[in-house]
Swiss-Prot record:
Keywords: Amino-acid biosynthesis, Aromatic amino acid biosynthesis, Lyase, Tryptophan biosynthesis. GO terms for biological process: L-tryptophan biosynthetic process. Tetramer of two alpha and two beta chains. It catalyses: (1S,2R)-1-C-(indol-3-yl)glycerol 3-phosphate + L-serine = D-glyceraldehyde 3-phosphate + L-tryptophan + H2O. SUPFAM superfamilies: Ribulose-phoshate binding barrel (SSF51366). This is Tryptophan synthase alpha chain. It comes from the Bacteria.
Length: 278
């Protein structure tokens, strides 16, 4: 059983939904990323998604694109993702929290599928979300991941045909990432009216947990989606708060790392309360 399988089995036994924050590696530096993840964990996050900055992101909106660019401008290298993983493994506040990478398939392909999985596992990651992996090209990576006990998480969107949804589910493990809205990542106040029906149909096709991401702007949208899902993925809303907190701290002379961690922790705490009350 993989760490993600164990986590979701435990959460189901507690009738609890997963809270999964997304953070960009190295925005603005590794110290901040580690501190924010630790604060999110203490505030009730169950697992985390670690973004691998890429110069040509496929599904990311302006907030995460800007975050990736800041990390790249600061000299990001893939080794920083592995360094962060090792630091999280050694950090008593977060070492038990499962973590996955959000990574472009082009990076995996360039390194080599087996090599990427090996490096990720050595750094303490238990899975990868690959947003630009076509289902027609997923079989080889899925096989490697299953053989190594590493979860491959794929995206299902509102416009994915039902046949493709079933095939994606067959080639995925850990959980399915259901994209709540069409388009790119970002905060939204209104969610599609057919979301409940779409997720309900998908749930009948697979035993995998279904986590919902894209468009979760705060506690209100989290509370709306919690009853439908097995977990919620919150990216842009957290990344924006971290960036704003860092800038605010710089202008006031405060500690940027501490300020960003406190801001992210407070926000995750509000999400946790809303999810648990839904």
């Amino acid at each position: 059983m993989t760490p993600l399988q164990s986590l979701f089995e435990s959460l189901r036994g507690q009738n609890r939904k997963a809270l999964m924050p997304f953070l960009t590696t190295g925005d603005p530096n590794i110290d901040t990323t580690e501190a924010v993840i630790a604060a999110a964990r203490q505030a009730g996050a169950d697992l985390c998604e670690v973004g691998v900055p890429y110069s040509d992101p496929i599904a990311d909106g302006p907030v995460i694109q800007a975050s990736y660019q800041r990390a790249l401008d600061a000299g990001f290298k893939l080794q920083h993702v592995w360094d962060l993983g090792q630091r999280l493994t050694e950090n008593p506040k977060v070492k038990a929290m499962p973590r996955v990478t959000m990574v472009s398939y082009s990076i995996i392909y360039r390194i080599g599928m087996a090599k990427y999985v090996d490096q990720a596992m050595q750094a303490g990651y238990c899975g990868a979300i690959v947003p630009d992996l076509l289902v027609e090209e997923a079989e080889d990576l899925s096989k490697i991941c299953r053989e190594k006990g590493f979860d491959l998480i794929q995206l299902v969107t509102p416009t994915t045909t039902r046949d493709r949804q079933c095939r994606i589910a067959e080639l995925s493990s850990g959980f399915l990432y259901y994209v709540s809205v069409t388009g790119i990542t970002g905060e939204r106040t209104a969610l599609p009216t057919n979301l409940v029906d779409n997720v309900g149909w998908l749930r009948e096709q697979t035993e995998l947990p279904i986590c919902i991401g894209f468009g979760i702007s705060g506690p209100e949208t989290a509370a709306q989606l919690a009853p439908v899902s097995d977990g919620l993925i919150v990216g842009s809303a957290i990344v924006r708060r971290v960036a704003d907190a860092v800038e605010k701290a710089k202008s006031s002379g405060a500690d940027p790392v501490k300020t960003a961690a406190e801001e992210a922790g407070d926000f995750c705490h509000s999400l946790r309360q809303a999810i648990d009350a839904a």
